[in-house]
UniProtKB/Swiss-Prot annotation:
<comment type="similarity">
    <text>Belongs to the FliW family.</text>
</comment>
<keyword id="KW-1005">Bacterial flagellum biogenesis</keyword>
<dbReference type="InterPro" id="IPR024046">
    <property type="entry name" value="Flagellar_assmbl_FliW_dom_sf"/>
</dbReference>
<keyword id="KW-0963">Cytoplasm</keyword>
<keyword id="KW-0810">Translation regulation</keyword>
<dbReference type="GO" id="GO:0071978">
    <property type="term" value="P:bacterial-type flagellum-dependent swarming motility"/>
</dbReference>
<dbReference type="GO" id="GO:0005737">
    <property type="term" value="C:cytoplasm"/>
</dbReference>
<protein>
    <recommendedName>
        <fullName>Flagellar assembly factor FliW</fullName>
    </recommendedName>
</protein>
<dbReference type="Pfam" id="PF02623">
    <property type="entry name" value="FliW"/>
</dbReference>
<dbReference type="GO" id="GO:0045727">
    <property type="term" value="P:positive regulation of translation"/>
</dbReference>
<dbReference type="GO" id="GO:1902021">
    <property type="term" value="P:regulation of bacterial-type flagellum-dependent cell motility"/>
</dbReference>
<dbReference type="GO" id="GO:1902210">
    <property type="term" value="P:positive regulation of bacterial-type flagellum assembly"/>
</dbReference>
<keyword id="KW-0143">Chaperone</keyword>
<dbReference type="InterPro" id="IPR003775">
    <property type="entry name" value="Flagellar_assembly_factor_FliW"/>
</dbReference>
<comment type="subunit">
    <text>Interacts with flagellin in a 1:1 complex. Two molecules interact with each CsrA dimer; cannot interact with both flagellin and CsrA simultaneously. Has a higher affinity for CsrA than for flagellin. Interacts directly with flagellin (hag), forms a 3-way complex of Hag, FliS and FliW in which Flis and FliW do not directly interact. Interaction with Hag may occur via the C-terminus of Hag.</text>
</comment>
<comment type="function">
    <text>Acts as an anti-CsrA protein, binds CsrA and prevents it from repressing translation of its target genes, one of which is flagellin. Binds to flagellin (hag), which is implicated in polymerization, and participates in the assembly of the flagellum. An antagonist to translational regulator CsrA, it binds CsrA at an allosteric site and non-competitively inhibits CsrA binding to hag RNA. Partner switching by flagellin between FliW and CsrA provides a flagellar assembly checkpoint to tightly control the timing of flagellin synthesis.</text>
</comment>
<dbReference type="GO" id="GO:0044780">
    <property type="term" value="P:bacterial-type flagellum assembly"/>
</dbReference>
Length: 143
């Protein structure tokens, strides 16, 4: 399947690479299909690219790279919605807001993206009763 991307131009992807956000992503509820594309070979950062909207791509990363103590409890309804039966199948990502200099970039730890890699279903989850924010600086450990 050929898609047009924000950072890589035209690309050929396989159907099994598509991640389904059944309810969309907050602010982009009509966008349901995304694919993860590396930004470079040796970078932990990847693009979460919409399959249908060329200019819609989020820079995401595993939050554990920058925030070693990051933790939260996944609510049962999300685990059921994503059909999670093994924690080994789960990937957690956080959306970044990039800035210059890089150390001023921030991570949205309040609303992580949860992906079940077994069935490629995902959801952005808003953590309730959390001390995390949408703008944690990634320049230093702060959680």
């Amino acid at each position: 399947m050929i898609i047009h991307t924000k950072y890589h131009g035209q690309m050929n992807i396989k159907e099994e690479q598509i991640i389904l956000f059944e309810s969309g992503i907050p602010g982009f509820l009509e966008e349901k299909q995304f694919v993860i594309l590396p930004l470079s070979e040796d970078s932990p950062f990847v693009a979460l690219q919409s399959v249908t909207s060329e200019n819609l791509a989020f820079i995401v990363v595993s939050p554990f790279i920058f925030f070693k103590n990051y933790e939260f409890d996944l609510d049962e309804s999300t685990a059921e919605l994503l059909d999670i039966d093994n924690i080994q199948d789960v990937e957690v990502m956080t959306i970044l807001t990039m800035a210059e200099p890089f150390e001023k970039s921030t991570a949205n730890l309040l609303a992580p993206i949860i992906v079940n890699r077994k069935n490629m279903m995902a959801k952005q989850v808003v953590l309730h009763d959390s001390s995390y924010t949408t703008k944690h600086p990634i320049g230093g450990e702060s959680c």
